[in-house]
């Protein structure tokens, strides 16, 4: 495999950037600071690291690229990708690299344009917090207080809430919280 020319390398770098910037997992990791204060810089560094990985290694297979990206996400963003998107991202980057190697830069630029349009039209992915069972209990208690109404009802509800949690200390120093029925 011959090394990529500088113009081809630039196109491939743009392609990698476009793929990673439209990948919801990385967007969420950056937006929520999974990589710390420098999450955005780490995402930009990933583009260079991935491009360098292709430059340094010949004839990469999608599963090797997938492993590399997975390792980067785990090390830099403390994120394990298990949504099924990682093989797609790896396949997309590998395909664009092959097109660059074959000199089909116009096709790669067209794909970059489509990805950039997708990025601007769809916006950024958002992480929504999952409601835990404990949150459900809190909502039920609030609803009970709302349904009771009046000051007497509120005092009954708050007493019931306090009675829900009974603490007892065991011999080993742990405090066990149990619900009364």
From Swiss-Prot:
Signal peptide: none annotated. It comes from Danio rerio. GO terms for biological process: maturation of SSU-rRNA from tricistronic rRNA transcript (SSU-rRNA, 5.8S rRNA, LSU-rRNA). InterPro entries: Pre-rRNA_process_TSR2. Residues 134-146 have a biased composition (Acidic residues). Keywords: rRNA processing. This is Pre-rRNA-processing protein TSR2 homolog. It holds the Pfam family WGG. The keyword rRNA processing applies. Belongs to the TSR2 family. Transmembrane segments: none annotated. Residues 118-133 have a biased composition (Polar residues). Residues 118-181 are annotated as: Disordered. One of its GO terms (cellular component) is nucleus. May be involved in 20S pre-rRNA processing.
